């Protein structure tokens, strides 16, 4: 027998009603100089993919944003160029994570692996312990940047109060 999801197991009715799951995931054209594929997977506390989530990324300087629903395997993708850094900070994207069971979206960040000096000087990233900071830095993988979101458990992504 299959039971319907309870309200606490969903993002709520407005997720389906008010938001389109149509991808708005190209913040840059694929042939733009410096264009990168940003890929990842949304994973729950048991290590299973979250196939009905949504990831929104915002250029920290506020110039661009994009949205990608997750597929059945929890995968999402974007086409981006590296955003400008704010003064005294490393280049990054701010990220909102929407997933079942959350009454409010979670906030986190994506930093770039080739910005070692800027990442070390970033006031937020440098305040985290090594394991926590590592959850916010994308990794290079087959010509793309990979950044997974782990909601709980081992290597859980760091989330911020907002």
Describe the role of every protein-language-model region.
Residues 1-134, 139-162:
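Beta-strand-dominated extracellular/periplasmic modules and repeats
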């Amino acid at each position: 027998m299959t039971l319907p999801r309870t309200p606490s197991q969903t993002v709520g009715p407005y997720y389906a009603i008010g938001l389109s799951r149509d991808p708005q995931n190209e913040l840059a054209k694929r042939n733009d100089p410096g264009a990168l594929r940003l890929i990842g997977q949304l994973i729950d506390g048991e290590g299973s993919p979250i196939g009905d989530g949504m990831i929104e990324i915002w250029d920290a300087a506020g110039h661009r944003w994009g949205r990608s629903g997750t597929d059945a395997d929890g995968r999402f993708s974007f086409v981006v160029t590296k955003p400008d850094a704010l003064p005294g900070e490393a280049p990054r994207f701010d990220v909102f994570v929407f997933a079942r069971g959350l009454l409010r979206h979670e906030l986190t960040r994506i930093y770039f692996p080739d910005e070692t000096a800027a990442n070390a000087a970033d006031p937020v990233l440098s305040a985290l312990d090594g394991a926590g900071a590592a959850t916010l830095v994308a990794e290079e993988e087959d010509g793309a940047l990979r950044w997974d979101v782990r909601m709980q458990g081992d290597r859980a992504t760091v989330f911020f109060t907002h």
